[in-house]
Amino acid sequence: MSGEENPASKPTPVQDVQGDGRWMSLHHRFVADSKDKEPEVVFIGDSLVQLMHQCEIWRELFSPLHALNFGIGGDGTQHVLWRLENGELEHIRPKIVVVWVGTNNHGHTAEQVTGGIKAIVQLVNERQPQARVVVLDLLPRGQHPNPLREKNQRVNELVRAALAGHPRAHFLDADPGFVHSDGTISHHDMYDYLHLSRLGYAPVCRALHSLLLRLLAQDQGQGAPLLDPAP
């Protein structure tokens, strides 16, 4: 499926429906902030990335890696693609780019969302050939079982298959088991049944941090050959 046929893989800025220009202001700030930085890791995605920056676990685990956080609430894959094409990777040479986006691609099929994520990976590979890409799985959402959970799970299956064997991209299933045996999600983990609480972020961030350290060690010749996390 080409970018012209797939809206999820066509770079598109967010429409400023509220009229305050905040999205574009954040984008310009990210570009400006990156000019004097030498991050080992860059995070890019939606509110799940953005809100991570406000948690103590960010300072504990990711600040020591000189990580940059380019998360914007509400972004879909097409918006991240636009941001990456318009300067957010221009002034830096990270060792790893973490991508967490797709749950906001409303109106797009699982196949289209997968195409958008694959386009992001390809763009990072082209713009930052030295960097590895880590794609986080889309988490379940909603207190009770619902079609969006099923769609996100399908995206995860497709992305995992698409990245299998990719030499510079890795898929991380960071869901520690947010869905309970009765099919519900607790507000202790996701306070609004979408966004993570501090309690919810902890296992996700620790799993991600472990993978990042393994990747960084491997690239420095200090680690054993990396195996992607098991399903």
Curated annotation (Swiss-Prot):
It is found in: Cytoplasm. CDD domains: PAF_acetylesterase_like. The modification N-acetylserine is found at residue 2. GO terms for molecular function: 1-alkyl-2-acetylglycerophosphocholine esterase activity; platelet-activating factor acetyltransferase activity; protein heterodimerization activity; protein homodimerization activity. The active site is at residues 47, 192, 195. Pfam families: Lipase_GDSL_2. Beta subunit (PAFAH1B1) inhibits the acetylhydrolase activity of the alpha1/alpha1 catalytic homodimer. It is an enzyme of class 3 (hydrolase). The modification Phosphoserine is found at residue 2. Its EC number is 3.1.1.47. One of its GO terms (cellular component) is cytoplasm. Keywords: Acetylation, Cytoplasm, Hydrolase, Lipid degradation, Lipid metabolism, Phosphoprotein. It catalyses: a 1-O-alkyl-2-acetyl-sn-glycero-3-phosphocholine + H2O = a 1-O-alkyl-sn-glycero-3-phosphocholine + acetate + H(+); 1-O-hexadecyl-2-acetyl-sn-glycero-3-phosphocholine + H2O = 1-O-hexadecyl-sn-glycero-3-phosphocholine + acetate + H(+); 1-O-hexadecyl-2-acetyl-sn-glycero-3-phosphate + H2O = 1-O-hexadecyl-sn-glycero-3-phosphate + acetate + H(+). InterPro entries: SGNH_hydro (IPR013830), SGNH_hydro_sf (IPR036514). Originally the subunits of the type I platelet-activating factor (PAF) acetylhydrolase was named alpha (PAFAH1B1), beta (PAFAH1B2) and gamma (PAFAH1B3). Now these subunits have been renamed beta (PAFAH1B1), alpha2 (PAFAH1B2) and alpha1 (PAFAH1B3) respectively. Belongs to the 'GDSL' lipolytic enzyme family. Platelet-activating factor acetylhydrolase IB beta/gamma subunits subfamily. Forms a catalytic dimer which is either homodimer (alpha1/alpha1 homodimer) or heterodimer with PAFAH1B2 (alpha1/alpha2 heterodimer). Component of the cytosolic (PAF-AH (I)) heterotetrameric enzyme, which is composed of PAFAH1B1 (beta), PAFAH1B2 (alpha2) and PAFAH1B3 (alpha1) subunits. The catalytic activity of the enzyme resides in the alpha1 (PAFAH1B3) and alpha2 (PAFAH1B2) subunits, whereas the beta subunit (PAFAH1B1) has regulatory activity. Trimer formation is not essential for the catalytic activity. Interacts with VLDLR; this interaction may modulate the Reelin pathway. Alpha1 catalytic subunit of the cytosolic type I platelet-activating factor (PAF) acetylhydrolase (PAF-AH (I)) heterotetrameric enzyme that catalyzes the hydrolyze of the acetyl group at the sn-2 position of PAF and its analogs and modulates the action of PAF. The activity and substrate specificity of PAF-AH (I) are affected by its subunit composition. This is Platelet-activating factor acetylhydrolase IB subunit alpha1. It comes from Pongo abelii. The gene is PAFAH1B3.
